[in-house]
Amino acid sequence: MLRIDKRFADEMVAHSMEEDPNECCGILSGTDGTVQELYRITNTTKSPYTYQMDPQEHLNADLDTERKGMEFVAFYHSHTHSPAYPSDTDVRMALQSGYLEVHYVLVSLENKAETYIRAYRIDELGNITEDQIEAD
């Protein structure tokens, strides 16, 4: 289970809307599956179909997270024209990154009047499992 305070959920949706029509991306840090910090990361591809996190911003988030005694609990990004479900590209990127212990959170802007967020785990074989989000 991933625990996300409403302010972080709202921030992910706001970030997604601000970057639309391009995908946004970011990192959620915390402890024990509870989000305590959100880092907006620049999508260097500036694309509506894929994202690539700015390496320096990713490193800065990593260092800040470690300094605060936290860990990465999730990576998030938006899907601007499709459901909040990992694409084949998302799965490939997760496997290549080696970050298989974190959640992958997707924000769907497919219907901008009814945005929604889902969280997934991706294992070493590329299997996708939806995980529950507990919103505070």
PLM features per residue range, with description:
Residues 1-72, 83-136:
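Conserved beta-strand-loop surface patch within small alpha/beta domains used
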Residues 77-81:
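Histidine-centered divalent metal-coordination motifs
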